[in-house]
A protein has these predicted regions:
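Surface-exposed, low-hydrophobicity beta-strand/loop segments enriched in small/polar/acidic residues
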Residues: 23-178
């Protein structure tokens, strides 16, 4: 049997969903930054738009899902690393947003797929999955309330680099609201 709703019931169901979504948005004052997460695109393309970039073996900083990564030129290769700045206009070779990685775990010698690349991991085959498409839209939590909420659209803003949650493999990058 197929469940069918009248137009009136559909409208009521949609109104309830809209109200619930609105209530959730209004209640989002919990300070729990999660980095940048892809939510859509400017065009009609797919959200499966990540590329692979090598991660430097022995990278001193952990990289987790939602972190902003930059290109790093080494003497023999170009790799990525977690961006440590605030993106306030300083010269940085921004690459994209880290979504996960694969590497051979030096402790188990097993190929590992993870949202988290541990700090100081020595793995010559480490590859990051990075969303680097300029048409992707992201969501990010701000670190506070904006003084003029109507004046935030279409603007650039610096970010705040929080300490990554390496247990869950989630970034703590947030948007600087000041």
């Amino acid at each position: 049997p197929v469940c069918q709703f009248s137009n009136q019931r559909k409208a009521h169901a949609l109104r309830n969903v809209t109200l619930k979504l609105t209530e959730e948005v209004k209640m989002s004052s919990i300070a729990a930054p999660f980095g940048l997460n892809p939510i859509g695109r400017f065009d009609a393309g797919s959200l499966e738009v990540f590329r692979q970039y090598p991660i430097k073996s022995g990278e001193s900083t952990a990289i987790v899902k939602g972190d902003i990564v930059q290109l790093v030129n080494a003497s023999n290769a170009t790799t990525i690393a977690k961006m440590t700045g605030t993106m306030d206009g300083s010269a940085t070779d921004l690459c994209g947003i880290f979504m996960g990685c694969r590497f051979t775990d030096p402790n188990t010698n097993q190929l590992t797929f993870s949202q988290h690349f541990p700090a100081s991991t020595v793995a010559s085959d480490a590859m990051a999955y990075v969303v680097d498409d300029p048409n992707v839209l992201f969501t990010i939590q701000a670190d506070g309330a904006f003084s003029n909420a109507r004046d935030i659209y279409g603007k650039n803003a610096p970010v705040v680099q929080g300490t990554a949650n390496t247990t869950l493999g989630i970034s703590r990058v947030s948007l600087d609201a000041s």
